[in-house]
């Protein structure tokens, strides 16, 4: 197994765990109404965005594990990595009012860099797979 495949598998496992955590946080936030204190009137929007981002992360994690194990199927991980990066940017923009509207969401920036690294590893595996065929 190449280094790119090993790295993609680790990144995909992290995605999988983060996806489950996002879904749990969104679910608990909706049920308990605890997101109101953080996001105020945008609480339901934040919960919906968090749930959608969790589903995308979960799907990217599954596709990444699948692609790391079987390189011919890594295209799904590549595409879901792009969707995850877009979803992270959307989450940062939609939850910006919670930070006063003028703050920089450094957490979202770090996650976008992580998303791009995931995409790059999936692309490397696609290139390796092309070379082998």
Whereabouts are the PLM-identified features?
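Cytosolic juxtamembrane helix and N-cap/initiation of the first transmembrane helix
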Residues: 1-31, 37-42, 124-128, 132-133
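Alpha-helical transmembrane segments of multi-pass membrane proteins
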Residues: 14-22, 50-53, 80-91
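Cationic, hydrophobic amphipathic alpha-helical membrane-interacting segments
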Residues: 21-27, 66-72, 93
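Juxtamembrane "helix-exit" motif on the non-cytosolic side of transmembrane helices
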Residues: 27-35, 93-100
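A loop-to-helix transmembrane entry motif
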Residues: 39-56
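Membrane-cytosol interface at the C-terminal ends of transmembrane alpha helices
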Residues: 53-69, 109-126
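Loop-to-transmembrane helix junctions at the membrane interface
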Residues: 56-88
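Membrane-helix boundary connector in multi-pass membrane proteins
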Residues: 87-107
